[in-house]
Amino acid sequence: MDTSGRKGSDMNIFSLFTLCGGLAFFLYGMTVMSKSLEKMAGGKLERLLKRMTSNPIKSLLLGAGITIAIQSSSAMTVMLVGLVNSGVMELGQTIGVIMGSNIGTTVTAWILSLSGITSDNVFVQLLKPESFSPIVALIGIILIMFTKSSKKKDIGSVCVGFAILMTGMTMMSGAVKPLADLPQFKEVLTILDNPIIAILVGAGITALIQSSAASLGILQSLAMTGSISFSMALPVIMGQNIGTCITALLS
């Protein structure tokens, strides 16, 4: 009795479960981190936006800076929608901030891309988020459990959120490797050769999970295994930027 096919099928199912679990960790970590950062900032971000959006360059830099700080362009967009609806800001003032926010959100992608670094050099290995995320998690847990200051507890939550996020990214990358060798999986990915379909897939997944960073994390996991080429990934990224607009529409 040949059990190799059945064993391979079971492994593929477990890889799919791991991919979904990794995505859940990623989304939860991103949520914990961004909400803790927003809580630390309090109402300062709104006041800062009111004061510094008269100059387009300042607006651009402010949008990029705040998005890098809170690690969520969606949260930034929702904040701007609230300020415009309340009449505090005009629509024209938000253009520079949104452009800056789109620049700032790429920092998340750069951090995630460090997972793909391959080198025997110890210092290069230390740049990989999974190398230092356990230490970051430990620092975060110590701050949460053994400090009384709410600000320090929030910093601890940011650290733990980052560690959970990177754990999810590592899980997704590990799950994609066995799936990449599966003929059926490769066949599904061939639909991305069509740019229109690739844009729709990127927009659909991002709108569904409400996070362009998580959607990009999945894409980077596929790229690390060589499952998709740059030409296939580019329209998906365009779709992801369209899909992330759903947050603004819902708000």
What are the residue ranges of the model-derived segments?
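Alpha-helical transmembrane segments of multi-pass membrane proteins, especially transporters
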Residues: 43, 51, 55, 63, ...
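Helix-loop-helix hairpins and the membrane-proximal interhelical loops
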Residues: 12-56, 155-204, 221-223
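Alpha-helical transmembrane segments and their lipid-water interface positions
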Residues: 25, 38, 74-78, 104-112, ...
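Short, Lys/Arg-enriched N-terminal segments with co-localized hydrophobic residues
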Residues: 1-10
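Short helix-coil transition sites and intra-membrane helix breaks within transmembrane domains
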Residues: 34-38, 66-75, 174-177, 205-214, ...
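Membrane-interfacial helix-loop connectors
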Residues: 79-98, 109-131, 206-243, 251
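Membrane-water interface regions at transmembrane-helix termini and the short interhelical loops
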Residues: 85, 118, 139-154, 251
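Residue-level signature of catalytic and energy-coupling elements of molecular machines
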Residues: 29, 71, 103, 168, ...
